[in-house]
UniProtKB/Swiss-Prot annotation:
Reaction catalysis annotation: Hydrolysis of terminal, non-reducing beta-D-glucosyl residues with release of beta-D-glucose
Membership in a protein family: Belongs to the glycosyl hydrolase 3 family.
Organism of origin: Butyrivibrio fibrisolvens
Gene behind this protein: bglA
Entry's Gene Ontology BP terms: cellulose catabolic process
Name by which UniProt lists this protein: Beta-glucosidase A
Cross-referenced InterPro entries: Cellulose_deg_GH3, Fn3-like, Glyco_hydro_3_AS, Glyco_hydro_3_C, Glyco_hydro_3_C_sf, Glyco_hydro_3_N, Glyco_hydro_3_N_sf, Glycoside_hydrolase_SF
Enzyme Commission number(s) from the entry: 3.2.1.21
Length: 830
């Protein structure tokens, strides 16, 4: 055993220097701003209008100037000491620019009035722009800045035009508000926004747009419009997002963000759009592995539908890439590293020299893509295989960038047996490699990796096989039919399913276990003969984990397999809570953008940028630093586990929680999130990647079936989780609510045991999402260790009586939880 995970209660003592708190400290807030600057993406900069020259007079337009959205709603929300909007950010630099005041006062008063009415940030209607203010502003300045903001959140998906039926969701008030505001869906500008933009364009020679959004939106309205000079994709930048945007607009920081998603010309251009709201009870992933750029770069006719490609982003300076090289690198003999074939080399190493040939210091992102032979399985035209961001290069400075790509990471999964059933394999043929600065801006390298025969990288077994998915897309844009089978309930149903889940869940919220207090001095008293074995003795190797668990009664074991009540600052419940044997009540906290504490507690924390922005940094170091800072805040506020990062795939722009997630690409999402996990766990705080898996829709999220092929599940939707598990050994994994191919994920032995534990070697604790619809005893059998926010002790005991469960099943689940708490999972430190 290396270290304890931080689960034992200690007072809320400051962890900073000189007795100061680190939570919401200036250091952490500055880090949040730095991260926001690093991930904002400059999409357009005609005539080099940006950065704004010193002495420029500017006029601000759009309710988004004050209606700033720091992040999305639900678990991703954070209670903060303040929020700095775009106007407040620009106001920090009044020595550099002059801001027209009448439009400022107009929008400030309007937004304040709307907030007083209880309308959420980002859900405010664009007001009509008074013509007298516009005329006066045009006389004052020739540069205009327009701010557009959007909001979405947990429990509901983004508005889309043309869907007239009522959609099952949990945030009907926000959906109704969206229906009032967004004429064409929130992907597009509203009529009021279009009118405001038109008025501004007609009166100013230089128009700059700042997009304060959490996900993909329409870009056609400005891409081909010569009257709009520059566009900054500012995303949702956390507590200091307005200041970060201001620093980029004024050239205090040179933008270096790159898109983590493809921006198509229309919402309808994404293959997922057509069926997203087709039915509340299921979603067919018929596009299969062709998600994001894999679709647009591969499928015939799709390339021209792209406005801004994956990996794209401008800078205020210019970089020259030269001296491209690629060569094989064999770290060890194939049999020594467990490869199945001696012909399989370890890696290709690609390198290029990046030189800043402009006049401004800046950073560039080098991206390595590969192209596998189509073979019998069919492949995307390009797949991201590696990336690296340069340091800040001064004008004239160069850096040699080297990226390694392991050959086994190019393997495809054969689910139907076209080559070898249920195998990860490399098909024979030529593998090509590309280096560049976006998926479109690449150079073909002069090294080709050629296989004369198919190579099996890993033989597994079929899991999560689809039962109702009728077809899937192929690389040529056609579809193949898939075999249909009946969903199988792995475990016998011994309890009737509730007819009204809503009432059941509401009852369970009130039924959470009571705190079982124990005199804290007893924790430090030496054990006496006859005393029960204590958990601390397991950590000290005085008692085996098996002996410790063996002494527990069935009732105690069953209790430990459910969530425990909130104490201290918590509002997402805890794990453990068996003080008579020294098992503490380890508290958890949300969420992906910072430690979330309920406003009524009175403790504020740092809101970091949304995960989409963090992905756009293409910088693992900044994600690690955010993880360290967030872990410190969790530690100082006495939490043992932080329910982050969220790494579901941006399958569709319509998903309401895309702001919590990183990218359309699983490799980028996995690497960025793995760095964050490493940072979190350097504090001995348990990181909890979620939502495992295929949580790509919020509407009817507890009843919707995600129907996907096994290949798509493994190559796209599980891959980010796999990277995190294998590289950083997270202490926990949080499941999702939805159904996957006819079976609830929390009841899926294939997912929780077959893939997560047996194939990937996961050793942490698996927890359900809070008050899901899975049956507790089935979850225990499948491999779910703790049912959150509370368990069903009586049901587990009855299941034992009815022979549906055995005591050893409870013991197995508790042994996994105990290993996590005592940190035998070896939480990795920096």
């Amino acid at each position: 055993m290396e270290k304890w995970a931080r689960i034992k209660y200690t007072p809320n003592l400051p962890l900073g220097e000189n007795g100061e708190r680190v939570t919401a400290s200036q250091k952490h807030i500055e880090l949040s701003c730095e991260a926001a600057c690093e991930g904002m993406v400059l999409l357009k900069n005609d005539r080099n209008v940006l950065p704004i020259r010193k002495g420029t007079r500017v006029a601000l337009f759009g309710k988004g100037v004050f209606d700033y959205v720091k992040g999305g709603g639900g678990s991703g929300d954070v209670t903060v000491p303040y929020i700095r909007n775009l106007y407040e950010g620009l106001s920090q630099y009044t020595s550099d620019i002059s801001i027209y005041d009448k439009s400022v006062r107009f929008y400030q008063e309007y937004v304040a009035d709307q907030y007083r009415l209880g309308i959420a940030p980002g859900m405010i209607k664009e007001p009509a722009l008074p013509e007298d203010i516009l005329a006066d502003a045009a006389a004052y300045a020739d540069t205009a800045i327009i701010a557009i903001s959007r909001f979405s959140g947990e429990g509901w998906d983004r508005k889309v035009a043309g869907v007239d039926r009522e959609i099952k969701c949990e945030a009907k008030d926000l959906v109704e508000q969206g229906n009032k505001i967004f004429d064409h869906g929130d992907f597009y500008l509203t009529n009021a926004e279009k009118k405001m933009v038109k008025m501004v364009k007609e009166n100013f020679s230089s128009v700059i747009v700042v997009m304060n959004v959490g996900g993909v939106v329409d870009t056609t309205w400005f891409k081909k419009d010569d009257q709009i000079s520059s566009v900054l994709m500012a995303w949702q930048g956390g507590i200091e997002g307005g200041l970060a945007a201001a620093r980029i607009l004024l050239g205090k920081v040179n933008p270096s963000g790159k898109l983590s998603d493809t921006f198509a010309a229309r919402l309808e251009d994404y293959p997922s759009t057509e069926g997203f709201h087709e039915d509340d009870d299921y979603v067919d992933y018929t596009e299969d592995i062709y998600v994001g750029y894999r679709y647009f770069e591969t499928i015939p006719g799709a390339k021209e539908k792209v406005n801004y490609p994956f990996g794209y982003g401008l800078s205020y300076t210019t970089f020259l890439l030269e001296d491209y090289k690629a060569e094989p690198f064999v770290a060890s003999a194939a049999d020594e590293v467990g490869k199945s074939d001696s012909d399989l080399a370890d890696a290709i190493v690609a390198s290029v020299t990046v030189t800043n040939i402009g006049k401004i210091p800046g950073k560039e992102v080098v991206q390595l893509y590969y192209s596998a032979p189509q073979g019998k399985l069919g492949k995307p035209a390009k797949v991201l295989g590696g990336y690296a961001k340069t340091r800040l290069l001064q004008p004239g400075e160069s850096q040699r960038v080297t990226i390694a790509l392991y050959m086994e990471d190019m393997a495809s999964y054969d689910d139907l047996g076209k080559v070898k059933k249920a195998a990860w394999l490399l098909e024979k043929g030529e593998y090509h490699f590309f280096l560049g600065t976006s998926v479109r801006d690449t150079r073909l390298l002069d090294y080709t990796y050629e296989l004369s025969k198919n190579i099996i990288v890993e033989q597994v077994s079929n899991k999560l096989v689809p039962t109702s998915l009728p077809k899937r897309m192929l690389a040529d844009g056609t579809y193949e039919e898939l075999p249909q089978t009946e969903p199988v309930d792995t475990y016998a149903t011994i309890f009737p399913r509730p007819k009204n889940w809503k009432e059941t869940i509401e009852h369970d919220v009130l039924k959470t276990p009571v705190v079982r207090p124990q005199d804290r001095f007893q924790l430090f008293l030496p054990p006496k003969e006859g005393d029960p074995k204590k958990f601390i003795e397991v950590a000290e190797c005085k008692v085996t984990l098996e002996d410790f668990i063996a002494q527990l009664s069935n009732e105690q074991l069953a209790s430990l397999l459910g969530g425990q009540p909130n104490v201290g600052m918590a509002n997402t419940f805890g794990y453990g809570n068996l003080p008579e044997v020294g098992v503490p009540n380890a508290q958890t906290c949300d969420g992906p953008a910072g430690v979330r504490i309920a406003p009524e507690v009175g403790v504020v924390t740092t809101a970091f940028p949304c995960s989409t922005l963090l992905a756009c940094t293409w910088n693992e170091d900044i994600c690690y630093e955010v993880g360290v800072a967030g872990g410190e805040e969790a530690k100082e506020c006495n939490f043992g586990a932080w329910l982050t990062p969220a790494v579901n795939i941006h399958r569709s722009p319509l998903c309401g929680r895309n702001f919590e997630y990183y990218s359309e690409d699983p490799f980028l999402a996995g690497k960025q999130a793995a760095a964050m996990v490493r940072g979190i766990q350097s504090n001995n705080i348990i990181a909890t990647p979620k939502h495992f898996a295929l949580n790509n829709k919020e509407s009817n999220r507890k009843g919707s079936d995600s129907r996907a092929s096994e290949r798509a599940i493994r190559e796209i939707y599980l891959k980010a989780f796999e990277i995190i598990v294998k590289e950083q050994s997270p202490g926990a994994s949080c499941l999702q609510y939805n159904i996957v191919n006819g079976q609830r994920s929390s009841e899926s032995h294939d997912l929780l045991t077959g893939i997560l534990r047996d194939e990937w070697g996961f050793e942490g604790v698996v927890v359900s999402d809070w008050w899901g619809f899975g049956e507790h005893y089935k979850e225990v059998l499948a491999g779910n260790d703790i049912k959150m926010g509370c368990g069903y002790t009586e049901q587990l005991l009855e299941a034992i009586d009815k022979k549906a469960l055995k005591r050893k099943d409870l013991e197995k689940r508790q042994s996994e939880s105990s290993r996590c708490f005592s940190n035998s999972t070896k939480l990795k430190a920096a």
